[in-house]
Amino acid sequence: MGLFDTLLGNASETSAEAVNEELMPILAANESVTAAFKLVRDLSVFTTKRLILIDKQGLTGRKVNYHSIPYKSITQFVVETAGHFDTDAELKIWLSGKADAIEIELSASSAQEVQRNLATQLFA
């Protein structure tokens, strides 16, 4: 991830192996990380069972919010790719029982990979 993307807050892919090791204490016994995308300090993590949105809060990032979304609760998703003057992409996911979408900013280069990961987990 380049400095410009970091400053803009655009997510880019990060090492699934490193994230798997970091999240080992909260993963189920038969669960592993398949892909992860970093947004400054926050992470969007795709596992074999769920999507985990990790929000590191505060100045030090010691307070962490883990939003766990089972794939079966995702009813639809939209990936909006970047345009000529728009440098970022966006993922919107809707959950059963919720009217509003959850929005996640992405880098233009990771939009297709995020869409592929979601499609693989939802439709495979």
Which residues does each predicted region cover?
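Anionic N-terminal interaction surfaces
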Residues: M1-S44, D100, S107-S109, A124
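Low-complexity intrinsically disordered segments
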Residues: K92-A124
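Hydrophobic transmembrane alpha-helix bundles
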Residues: E22, A35, Y71-V79, E103-E105, ...
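Phosphoinositide-binding peripheral membrane targeting modules
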Residues: L27-L43, T47-A99
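Charged, low-complexity, helix/coiled-coil-prone segments
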Residues: N10-L23, I52-H67, T120-L122
